[in-house]
Amino acid sequence: MKIICLFIPFRKIRHKIKKTFLLKNIQRDKIDSYLPKKTLIQINKYNNEDLIKLNKAIIGGGHKGYFNYDEKSKDPKSPLNPWAFIRVKNEAITLKASLESILPAIQRGVIGYNDCTDGSEEIILEFCKQYPSFIPIKYPYEIQIQNPKSEENKLYSYYNYVASFIPKDEWLIKIDVDHYYDAKKLYKSFYIPRKNYHVISYSRIDFIFNEEKFYVYRNKEGEILKAPGDCLAIQNTNLFWKEILIEDDTFKWNTAKNNIENAKSYEILKVRN
């Protein structure tokens, strides 16, 4: 399919063909079919809340999770044992709860941070002290989205720096710390990849907190579930982040073609051939 697409001159047609033949949507209630039956039975005996509570009492490593019920999860090359790829800047409000929510699913990770002034750094260092399989990585440059002074001040350089601490050919999953994760469903999703080139792209639901109440966000079409985006589980083979210049409205993610001097410098994931 990749070879065929190379000879199709129109980008939109190539994209449509790839989407039709290469992408597979997996419903949440279908994921259990990817797990060995014995493992599934063991995992379903436990819940996220009990494991999170158990892990809060653990100091110095060895936190517990669903990965304890499959020996393959001990393999550092297995998709069942991905590195959490985390970047933080001033997210103290949600940071601790988000990190604790992934522990029953994820055994290790790197936590990059920069320019933190709200106590996020202290939360990260305390978390990594309690769970030393997570590595704190302080980026030594300020990130400047608009008019960056140097390459080191650009977001893509920050991503590449943090990712450099993840061993090559091992799996990673991009974790955002303004998200709260269902660890059981997250861990089960790691059974989806069957080949090293398989990639999982996760959808999500957005919540709005207003006047002491939570609301589920719906788009103009009334849809709750957001389309899968850049929250990926992928093998760290020939990956790198590249600069992409975006117009002011970052929600539309329009690539800047004119007025480059006022564009914002973001990042896009690429794979070296």
Predicted regions and their residues:
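Short beta-strand-to-loop acidic/aromatic patch adjacent to the donor-nucleotide binding site
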Residues: 169-180
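A short acidic, amphipathic alpha-helical/loop segment
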Residues: 97-101, 123, 185-189
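Catalytic-site signature of metal-activated, phosphate-bearing donor transferases
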Residues: 3-72, 149-160, 179-273
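Active-site beta-to-alpha loop of glycosyltransferases that engages the nucleotide-sugar donor
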Residues: 79-100, 115
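Active-site-proximal specificity loops/subdomain of glycosyltransferases
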Residues: 60-79, 119-171
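Short, well-formed alpha-helical segments that are part of the catalytic scaffolds
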Residues: 63-71, 91-109
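Short beta-strand/loop segment that forms part of the nucleotide-sugar
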Residues: 107-118, 139
